[in-house]
Amino acid sequence: APGGEWRPAAGRPLAQWPDGSVRWLLVSFGAREAGTHRLVVNPDTVPTQPEVRLTQVDGRWIIDSDRLHMVVCEAGPGILGELVCDGVPRLEHPGDLCLSVDDASTRYEQKRTVQVIESSPLRVRLRVSGQLVEADGTCRLHYRLGIEIWAGWPAVRLDCHYFNLQRGVL
């Protein structure tokens, strides 16, 4: 950092050379001040505290950090089964947080796909893909929801994209 403070960083390979070595690396870190930052590689560095952890058990993706506990579900009425911040539950029922457009919602969705984009001690990023469905089971739109949690931060970043993948249906 410009002021001399060391900040933890994590890397995710974006492209590799034919021999398997990293060609392009996305480096993530939490900047706390504006200005020029310098990347220093130190292979002897131990993981930072606090850290964020991701585990998967029976279709449930559990994200734990020092401030947040979140469960992302592959099935059921809600994308999030649990959301707890600083020990305080933020969802009463799994369906309390849903994506909706008109009468279509993730509450009626039977199954969704969860993909791990990044999992490091510093940050966890998931991509949830599914459908907005009406009560009668009619699919109206597909969605892709990005979920991002950083160690040490009491916040969740959500970004959602909707897709109309049904030919001839608006």
Language model: regions and residue ranges:
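Aromatic-lined carbohydrate-binding surfaces of glycoside hydrolases
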Residues: 97-99, 108-109, 132, 163
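Acidic, contiguous internal or C-terminal segments within carbohydrate-active enzymes
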Residues: 71-74, 116-170
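Alpha-mannosidase-like glycoside hydrolase catalytic domains involved in N-glycan trimming
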Residues: 1-62, 66, 73-78, 82-91, ...
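Extended, charge-enriched "interface" segments that sit outside catalytic cores
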Residues: 105-115
